[in-house]
Design a protein with these regions (language model features):
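Transmembrane alpha-helices
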Residues: 249-273, 285
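Transmembrane helix-bundle core of multi-pass membrane transporters
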Residues: 160, 164-227, 253-256, 275-284
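Structural signal for alpha-helical transmembrane segments and their membrane-water exit/capping regions
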Residues: 64-81, 108, 179-187, 222-228
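Single transmembrane alpha-helix segments in multi-pass membrane proteins
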Residues: 67-132, 155-162, 292-295, 299-309, ...
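Membrane-interfacial amphipathic/re-entrant helices at transmembrane-helix boundaries
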Residues: 3-99, 132-137, 248, 256
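Alpha-helical transmembrane segments within multi-pass membrane transporters and channels
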Residues: 133-172, 314-315
Length: 359
């Protein structure tokens, strides 16, 4: 049938029905974004913002540390000198390494009061053996001594079931007596010149002790975050009986953790020998308490099951910056223990307050 004149003049679109127009409009309209694309911001904030009291304490202490460093750099020209900043890092190295090992023990639900005297004993053992058999053999003997002391502590805590405070306090007393009897309470000196050569080594101005500190911290960080053993440490610290029922060898985990703590103490003691050039039985008397204080100030509670290596690093750097600032402003060293104790009380009190509010 031929088209009429009106039909020939009508545009092609006029033949489209209303339903067709509606369907095309709906198909062209932008669709709402998928639900997952709307959830990225809350997920990101959950990862960034602290969600537990210990994380809050850690972020607060990190903020205080950064602010203190910035203020001291502005207020004191000596503090911001590169030599002084590198000196701060070296001063933090020995106790920082011990604090790294202490962090693992505290996460597992314990701690070690003997690490200071173990560090001194390992240093003296390394120094004494090096006189007859060379520095390399001396260092090896010192490391084995620290590892053995930590292993004994682990056996006392895990296998015999002695409270960590009692076990490590007893170990501290035994090692102190043996060390002073063996050395006559006198330093071991003079030592081969290779010791001081080792202590003076540096890379781009960063001392050997500081580099060792960084390497040890990175290794411990990897162990906690990237290994099954690290997951077991958290599990044991959270619930020992539950971990046993889950098939975790709790005793092995605890023994390994205390052995690592003893090894870290030995590394610190040997580093001190390389810096000072002597093996002294009187060194490290306050290292255990400083290491525990550093972990607590960094935001890790003594309850176990939570925390990270960053807590130990933040804590020890905070204490070292405080000590350095006191020295720069000629404040008596007697104030340092009082200020350290105050920082510990504030950190623990703040965490307890946050926990009470959440309940």
């Amino acid at each position: 049938m031929p088209l009429t004149e009106d039909q020939q003049k009508r545009p092609p679109s006029a033949g489209i029905s209303v339903d067709d127009v509606g369907r095309s409009t709906r198909s062209a309209a932008p669709q709402p974004p998928h639900a997952s694309s709307q959830e990225w911001l809350p997920a990101l904030l959950k990862r960034i913002l602290p969600s537990t009291p210990s994380q809050v304490v850690q972020r607060v202490m990190l903020t205080v540390l950064v602010a203190s460093v910035v203020i001291l750099c502005i207020a004191n020209p000596i503090f911001r000198q590169s030599d002084n900043l590198l000196n701060v890092l070296q001063q933090a190295a020995m106790v920082g390494i011990i604090a790294g090992g202490m962090q693992l023990m505290i996460i597992s639900g314990g701690f070690d009061l003997s690490v200071g005297i173990v560090a001194a004993a390992a240093g003296c053992a390394a120094a004494y053996v090096s006189l007859q058999h060379g520095i390399a053999i001396g260092i090896l003997v010192g490391l084995v001594a620290g590892l053995l002391a930590g292993f004994v502590n682990g056996i006392l805590v895990a296998k015999i079931g002695i409270n960590p405070f009692v076990a490590t306090f007893g170990t501290q007393a035994v090692v102190t007596g043996l060390l002073y009897a063996a050395t006559g309470a006198t330093p071991i000196a003079p030592l081969p010149s290779g010791w001081t050569d080792l202590g003076l080594k540096n890379v781009a101005g960063i001392s050997f002790a500081s580099l060792t500190f960084v390497v040890v911290i990175l290794i411990l960080l990897f162990v906690l975050r990237c290994t099954l053993f690290g997951q077991h440490i958290y599990a044991v610290g959270s619930n020992k009986e539950g971990s046993r029922r889950a098939g975790i060898h709790v005793d092995r985990v605890l023994i390994a953790v205390y052995a690592i703590g003893g090894l870290c103490a030995a590394i610190a003691g040997i580093l001190l020998v390389s810096i000072s050039g002597i093996g002294s039985p009187a060194t490290g008397t306050q290292w255990a308490l400083l290491a525990i204080a550093a972990v607590i100030i960094g935001g890790t509670p003594l309850t176990g099951g939570v925390g990270g290596i960053s807590s130990a690093v933040i804590g020890i750097l905070s204490l070292t910056v405080l000590t350095n600032a006191l020295n720069l402003y000629s404040v008596s060293a007697y104030w340092q223990p009082a200020l350290t104790g105050t920082a510990v009380l504030l950190a623990v009190g703040f965490e307890a307050f946050r926990s009470a509010r959440k309940r």
